[in-house]
Amino acid sequence: MPDFKIVISDPQTKESKIKKVKVKVSDQIQSIQGEKEGKALPIAKINQKLKEELGLDTLLTLQTIKQEGDKKVKVKTHFKIEIDNNVPSDEVWIAASIAEKYGANEFEAEAYRTKSFQLSIDQSKLSNIIGAKIGDVIELNVSGIPLKVKITGGSDNSGFPMRYDVPGGAKRKLLLSGPPGFYPEEDGMRRKKTVRGNMITQDIVQINTIIIR
């Protein structure tokens, strides 16, 4: 079975506080199976003070600019946080396997609360999601973090979007006046477009969700 790409957004993360931090490799942190393939969230150790300062829940994003040849590339990683007050309040400790992505064992980065992230999860591990519909609330375990999320949309393996107002899971060609599936350039425009129904089937590859608390 192919993987589902699950996009998880946190509606409580609106105006994130951003802080410049020093990121260091720590041999206390082991790499997590699947983190390089986007199947699991890597771990970052931080001080309780930094967690409170940034208003974090369970996730942290680190972002920096990396020079690649004559180009500057944005590098961003989402982490599951672990509190360790041996970590200075202006530092974040990560595993060496993740530091490879940044090209250094020590570097400066912007740290902030994660707004959204994507994980690839084997369909066989989410068998309960087949048949669920847009608007349904499901439970996920993301790298040991239990989450309750609401399905808000998705798309199939051809890129056709799911629509909340189309029952079932089959593809249909409909006359649309707005998204998802059609973004009119002028008021009143309508077009026939192919879309998916509101039910998740094995043909769906991306599922969009928001965290429910």
From Swiss-Prot:
Gene Ontology biological process: translation
Keyword DNA repair set for record: no
Cellular component GO terms, alphabetical: ribonucleoprotein complex; ribosome
Keyword annotations: Ribonucleoprotein, Ribosomal protein
Gene Ontology MF: a single term: structural constituent of ribosome
Family matches, as InterPro entries: Ribosomal_eS6 (IPR001377), Ribosomal_eS6_arc (IPR020924), Ribosomal_eS6_CS (IPR018282)
Stored SMART domains: Ribosomal_S6e (SM01405)
Family of this protein: Belongs to the eukaryotic ribosomal protein eS6 family.
Official protein name in the record: Small ribosomal subunit protein eS6
Organism: Sulfurisphaera tokodaii (strain DSM 16993 / JCM 10545 / NBRC 100140 / 7) (Sulfolobus tokodaii)
Lineage: Archaea, Thermoproteota, Thermoprotei, Sulfolobales, Sulfolobaceae
Protein encoded by which gene: rps6e
